[in-house]
């Protein structure tokens, strides 16, 4: 477990640490060698969001989960494992270790909007992995896989730099668990 880095990042373009990956940027960019062996890390990073791409200020106070200060949990692989293992382990953690009811779990998968010039391609790998997991759990993948756009499911570090599709898990916490994936 890697300790939270300072809220005042060593980065000229950031006022505050706004994401769990900030302290790992030099590793992602190949400027530093990964100090973790194997190439894995987990962290709980204190974050402040006060502007920029992931600005949550307009949502603070409008619901129960948007805050401008929070702790972001993260697990990171630096060439040690990839999407298949990450998705399988996330499912295992939620449903077998933490015992969340499987029927309340939904996964998002990146689906670009070509008319908006969204980058990259549909994340077929993540879709196929989630499809198999939900099917094996006796759940309808077409209900439990939700398509996300560039804003929600394409991770970018500024206008240039490391980027790519991401997949997120959401838990339906409504009393009747009847959102059917309407996140």
Task: Locate predicted features.
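Structured aminoacyl-transfer and RNA-binding surfaces used for tRNA recognition/handling
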Residues: 1-183
């Amino acid at each position: 477990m890697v300790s939270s880095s300072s809220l005042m990042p060593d980065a000229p373009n950031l006022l505050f640490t706004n994401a769990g990956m900030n302290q790992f940027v030099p590793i992602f960019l190949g400027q530093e060698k990964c100090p973790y062996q194997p190439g894995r890390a987990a962290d709980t990073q204190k974050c402040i969001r006060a502007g920029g791409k992931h600005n949550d200020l307009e949502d603070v106070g409008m619901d129960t989960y948007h805050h401008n200060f929070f702790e972001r949990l993260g697990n990171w692989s630096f060439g040690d494992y990839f999407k298949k293992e990450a998705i399988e382990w996330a499912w295992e953690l939620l449903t077998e270790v933490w015992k969340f009811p499987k029927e309340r779990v939904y996964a998002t998968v990146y689906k670009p909007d070509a008319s908006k010039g969204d980058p990259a391609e549909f994340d077929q790998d993540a879709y196929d992995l989630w499809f198999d997991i939900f099917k094996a759990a006796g759940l309808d993948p077409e209900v439990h896989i939700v398509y996300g756009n560039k804003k929600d499911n394409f991770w970018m570090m500024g206008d240039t730099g490391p980027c790519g599709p991401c997949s997120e898990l959401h838990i339906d916490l409504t009393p009747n668990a009847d959102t059917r994936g309407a996140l």
